[in-house]
């Protein structure tokens, strides 16, 4: 099935110094890890057809009695809660699921707790086998993903690519129609690759048939519908499930701050892609006026229901008015909290948010997560905005729902409304930062560090073909033993870039540990007007951040684009990854894995640019690191060391009357070239 490409965080040994960077550990799996890895993949194989997936395990699941084995779980109350819900009826198999419906969330949460509190992996596996047979497929997949990410005994166990598990969230309905009929009608061209027969289906993105003159947002369809980007967003929200209390499940205490900053990075990356397509800043919107961007998905759910659409410049439906009244009240309370500096907690006491943990508190109440100081008073403007802008009808009953794209994490970023929601939310972030005391020059200028030079290789982007195997997400007949195994693959073009290096020379007056940050931002706006500094620094996007040891004198550093701290390469297809597991189990061949399970798609590090070269600028910042630093640990992103400064430093609080000119900081003009496919064989 798949394995992430090895990313070594290494800065080269060059002329004047040895420069060491922090890196993600790579481990060699022992047999226990391999067996767990194999079983997890089998738990997520053909979830809609468990008896066809493995009849032995299907029978084992049916034989497992949770109530009779209540002592096999570490939390009897959680088991009783689940059994009570199950006996009163849960979401039937085949029905649609979304976290944004309280009853469905309650059921899924109870199932997750059942998985989480299994006393060992064997009990967890048996419980999951039972649930695979009896629980709604989407509830099962989501709760199992969350449990594997959270349980102590499944740390860094890889999960199947979500776009293989749930292709209906990633590909157009006409493509999946062909996939479902590929074997029945035999109309698709096939090819033989190794031991498999492959069916290749070319695919467009949604809206390929629309007139772009009237729907300019469609220029960005290759970006907002990228399967790697949408899978990244799913895992971003899995890092801190909004319904999960941090203390109860030992989650880090910066979830609110990470929620805000990670969405700020996504928004800035999106903005750079807008510039590459000559689109302006996002417009403001009013809850009492028509909403500009339309959304016309050509996707259907696995049960055949279409994703809801939203016409361009449409008035809000009457059945959304109750949510509009509520969100306007909640937004006014959050604005008042930022302006006053105080929020009201559950005990009716005022709490100062201009404190060390203040931004984290603010992020929690905006998201409305389980750590919010006062969910009743501040609600969740994140959830309410999705409810309103999704334009889906109200549920006919608690189990008859048609979620909008905004109510499914892996489809949220496809809707242009997503970016309007988070522009509004990130405006609160900027407002909070502007209310804080700005940095003084002594906090960001370090004369003992001087950047002598900063260059970067030629930056070239292009579109490439990518094949996705989707067998696991389709209903398929049992294959005859004499048939050659077949794979159904969807082929799409995706944005990528040629690898490149940053070349940095730093002069240090003494040996020290330092932190290097690299940001990319616009040079001009969509009207070709030079951006303003520091006002427009809020649009800069952090692409790298690492610590290293500097020697006294000149230090020459080379940093490759593959090393950027939060990126990773594409995942291997499931059939390849699974074969590696079995090979290692049946031989002496080692199986290695990274201590992380996902990252931002490295392909999308750079905006598309233009054929003639599009101007952007890099901002390089170097600062000393004290003996103390932050050890960032994530079950999804891995472990990494950062200095103790805030996310986005030093651009998070712009310093006015200062052009960010100093010995330890530097702006660098760059051009990003986009090459057509037929140009890629030409040497430049």
UniProtKB/Swiss-Prot annotation:
Keyword tags: Chromosome, Cytoplasm, Glycoprotein, Nucleus, Secreted, Signal, Storage protein
One MF annotation (Gene Ontology) recorded for this entry: nutrient reservoir activity
Entry-linked SUPFAM superfamilies: Di-copper centre-containing domain, E set domains, Hemocyanin, N-terminal domain
UniProt cross-references to InterPro entries, sorted A to Z: Di-copper_centre_dom_sf, Hemocyanin/hexamerin, Hemocyanin/hexamerin_mid_dom, Hemocyanin_C, Hemocyanin_C_sf, Hemocyanin_N, Hemocyanin_N_sf, Ig_E-set
Domain Hemocyanin N-terminal: 33-155
Residues that carry a glycan: 54, 204, 681
Subcellular localization, as worded in the UniProt entry: Secreted; Nucleus; Cytoplasm; Cytoplasmic granule
Tissues expressing this chain: Expressed in the fat body in a caste specific manner and secreted into the hemolymph (at protein level). Present in trophocytes and oenocytes of the fat body (at protein level). Expression level is increased in workers whose ovaries have become active in response to the absence of a queen (at protein level). Present in the nuclei of germline and somatic cells in the ovaries of workers and queens, and the testes of drones (at protein level).
Superkingdom of this protein's organism: Eukaryota
GO-annotated cellular components: chromosome; cytoplasm; extracellular region; nucleolus
One of the Pfam families matching this protein, by short name: Hemocyanin_M
Domain Hemocyanin C-terminal: from-to ranges: 438-674
Induction statement: In 5th instar larvae induced by juvenile hormone. In adult workers induced by a protein-rich diet.
Segment forming the signal sequence: 1-21
Start and end residues of each Hemocyanin middle domain: 161-429
Note: Hexamerins are evolutionarily related to hemocyanins but do not bind copper and have lost the ability to bind oxygen.
Subunit description: Probable homohexamer.
Job of this protein: Storage protein that may function as a nutrient supply to compensate for lack of dietary proteins during metamorphosis and egg production. Arylphorin that may be a source of aromatic amino acids during cuticle formation. May have a secondary role as a nuclear protein involved in regulation of gene expression. Involved in gonad cell proliferation.
Sequence similarity: Belongs to the hemocyanin/hexamerin family.
Protein name as catalogued: Hexamerin 70a
Species this protein is from: Apis mellifera
